[in-house]
Swiss-Prot record:
One of its GO terms (cellular component) is mitochondrial small ribosomal subunit. It comes from Arabidopsis thaliana (Mouse-ear cress). Protein S19 forms a complex with S13 that binds strongly to the 16S ribosomal RNA. GO terms for biological process: ribosomal small subunit assembly; translation. The keyword Ribosomal protein applies. GO terms for molecular function: rRNA binding; structural constituent of ribosome. PROSITE patterns: RIBOSOMAL_S19 (PS00323). Belongs to the universal ribosomal protein uS19 family. It is found in: Plastid, Chloroplast. This is Small ribosomal subunit protein uS19c. It holds the Pfam family Ribosomal_S19.
Amino acid sequence: MTRSLKKNPFVAKHLLRKIEKLNTKAEKEIIITWSRASTIIPTMIGHTIAIHNGREHLPVYIIDLMVGHKLGEFSPTINFRGHAKNDNRSRR
């Protein structure tokens, strides 16, 4: 279910503070976060955010097309390696 338009998008406070601090200094550095549920807002455009996928932090450069999506969408947690091979030939 989508979030109500009356409510603001969810962004973790610590993440928002870090981005606003970098915007006032006009600096660009990698921001490390575990907050996959935070929504990407226009003030994040141009920053690189390292999003935790359960094992490591994956750096993601934020562009304007990502606004409105969640950070977790750009950091996959599962690496699909393909289905198991059908091993009927070795059984004969």
